């Protein structure tokens, strides 16, 4: 058996490897310099006279931000005495101004979301009044429904904002099965949030290759990031080690490695899993069954036990996530009976842990990514399966972008982080006709780009603001309130109709 390989790599470009890997050739990843980097000449550090002087920080911001920073500069100019204060206090004054700007824009964003939500629900309220036909009882019902939704939504929104600010800062994250597919996408998303991540896989070569790829993604992010995002990315760190989650000794080594590298573990994600295709149980070999059960169920048990042993002795505790899948709710999974039984077992395991850890500082949760276009899902899939995948499947990067922000701010225990939220399900149903052929053509051939091509333009795609992103700006409770109002309006229409509806 190959010796376990340990690879360390951070955004600062430091790379060291365990003695087992010293004999192997490797290429040091090229690092991109930040925009703010100044090229200095060899003679005493003086800048070359032939190049024009770089713009000052204030000038660069005015060019990048446009009218907003021009307005700020005008206000500072009218203040007059502020320039002297800026010179007296130097960088402290500038940092104070930047901090005030950050707080202002954060508050303005939250207020803007609240106003938009109020306006949207107000439109529904007005439609309800029009449909009621002046009935005072109906108007009272609609009014109280709207008022209750506003109060509940305001409380939930305020709590979410407080949680986000209280839990700001880098997290220490361990992800098993994170050298490809969803696990790799989760690791990338945590790194882009400024977190420190430990990746793990059976193959030392896969660990090394994945770390190099993730480092390149971070450097690409640094090259295009603005100041605030750049400061966040500078905290990112990725390290990795080989680990077979089926072996208790490997899991213990992974825990010790994470403690040595990160100091503590805030989030542990049991993502390692396998499936051997779609076929009846009688066609599965002994080795297939043993590997599926060992990886999906036994591996999660071992990792959860070791993670909880560490977290319960930490001052801030920690959170463990087990991944849901087909069969988690106890429903039948024809042609994937072994895989489904392991996921159903994890659901019972989760319920038992919740009672065991009531007074513990460790939170145990589930994460449901839905159907993700990974090798695990596509192995042995038929043409009919692929046509269905066009409607409800998503790319790993898309799912990770939704799950990670929720995982980072989770609190308590027993939370279910789901990708298929009500807005997404509604959107999938409404756009079902458009989604035909999205990932596979009529003959079942893949038409989506490979991972390397998708990640090449990841920075641009992250900057886009889609309709789904707009829907996700609001909590599920907000959408429940809006849906409840629509049900009330439908009830008014049905109850106020004088006769039977057409077609009944």
Curated annotation (Swiss-Prot):
Q: Which Pfam families match?
A: adh_short
State the phenotype upon gene disruption. Answer: Stay-green phenotype during senescence. Grana stacks fused into large stable stacks during semescence.
Per its record, how is this protein called by name? Probable chlorophyll(ide) b reductase NYC1, chloroplastic
UniProt signal peptide? none
- Lineage, opening ranks: Eukaryota, Viridiplantae, Streptophyta, Embryophyta, Tracheophyta
Task: Kindly list the places in or outside the cell where this protein is found, as annotated in its UniProt entry.
Answer: Plastid, Chloroplast thylakoid membrane
Q: Where is this region: Disordered?
A: 41-63
Keyword Transit peptide (UniProt): yes
Oligomer and partners: Interacts with NOL to form a complex that acts as a chlorophyll b reductase.
A Gene Ontology BP annotation from the UniProt entry: PSII associated light-harvesting complex II catabolic process
Residue ranges spanning the membrane: these are 114-134, 141-161, 479-499
Primary location group: plastid
Write down the chemical reaction(s) this protein catalyses: 7(1)-hydroxychlorophyllide a + NAD(+) = chlorophyllide b + NADH + H(+); 7(1)-hydroxychlorophyllide a + NADP(+) = chlorophyllide b + NADPH + H(+)
Species the sequence originates in = Oryza sativa subsp. japonica (Rice)
């Amino acid at each position: 058996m190959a010796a376990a390989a340990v690879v360390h790599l951070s955004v600062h470009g430091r790379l060291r490897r365990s003695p087992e890997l010293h004999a192997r050739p490797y290429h040091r990843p090229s690092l991109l310099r930040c925009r703010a980097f100044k090229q200095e000449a060899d003679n005493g550090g003086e800048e070359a006279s032939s190049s024009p002087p770089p713009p000052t920080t204030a000038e660069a911001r005015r060019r990048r931000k446009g009218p907003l920073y021009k307005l700020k500069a005008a206000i500072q100019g009218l203040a007059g005495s502020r320039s002297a204060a800026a010179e007296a206090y130097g960088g402290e004054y500038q940092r104070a101004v930047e901090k005030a700007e950050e707080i202002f824009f954060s508050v303005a964003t939250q207020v803007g979301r609240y106003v938009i939500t109020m306006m949207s629900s107000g439109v529904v309220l007005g439609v309800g009044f029009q449909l009621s036909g002046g009935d005072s009882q109906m108007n009272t019902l609609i009014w109280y429904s709207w008022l209750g939704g506003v109060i509940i939504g305001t409380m939930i929104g305020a709590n979410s904002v407080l949680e986000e600010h209280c839990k700001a800062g880098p997290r220490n994250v361990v992800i098993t099965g994170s050298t490809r597919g969803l696990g790799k996408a989760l690791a990338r998303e945590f790194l882009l949030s400024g977190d420190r991540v430990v990746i793990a896989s059976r193959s030392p070569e896969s660990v090394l290759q994945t770390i190099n790829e993730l480092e390149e993604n971070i450097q690409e992010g640094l090259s295009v990031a603005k100041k605030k995002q750049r400061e966040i990315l500078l905290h990112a760190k990725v390290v990795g080690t080989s680990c077979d989650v089926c072996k208790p000794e490997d899991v213990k080594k992974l825990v010790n490695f994470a403690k040595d590298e990160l100091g503590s573990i805030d989030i542990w994600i049991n993502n390692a899993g396998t499936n051997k295709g779609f076929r009846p149980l009688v066609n599965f070999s002994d080795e297939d069954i043993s590997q599926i059960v060992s990886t999906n169920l036994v591996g999660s048990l071992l990792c959860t036990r070791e993670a909880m042993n560490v977290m319960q002795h930490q001052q801030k505790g920690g959170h463990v996530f087990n991944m849901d899948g087909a069969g988690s709710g106890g429903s039948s999974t024809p042609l994937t009976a072994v895989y489904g039984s392991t996921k159903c077992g994890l659901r019972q395991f989760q319920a038992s842990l919740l009672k065991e850890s009531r007074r513990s500082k460790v939170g145990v949760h589930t994460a449901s990514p839905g159907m993700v276009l990974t090798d695990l899902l596509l192995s042995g899939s038929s043409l009919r399966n692929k046509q269905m995948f066009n409607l409800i499947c998503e790319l790993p990067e898309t799912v990770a972008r939704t799950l990670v922000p929720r995982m980072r701010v989770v609190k308590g225990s027993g939370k279910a982080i789901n990708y298929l939220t009500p807005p997404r399900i509604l959107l999938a149903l409404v756009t079902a006709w458009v989604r035909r052929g999205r990932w596979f053509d009529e003959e079942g051939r893949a038409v989506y780009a490979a991972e390397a091509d998708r990640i090449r333009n990841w920075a641009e795609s992250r900057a886009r603001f889609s309709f789904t992103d707009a829907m996700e700006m609001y909590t599920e409770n907000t959408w429940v309130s809006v849906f409840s109002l629509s049900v009330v309006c439908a009830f008014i229409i049905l109850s106020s109709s004088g006769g039977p509806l057409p077609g009944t």
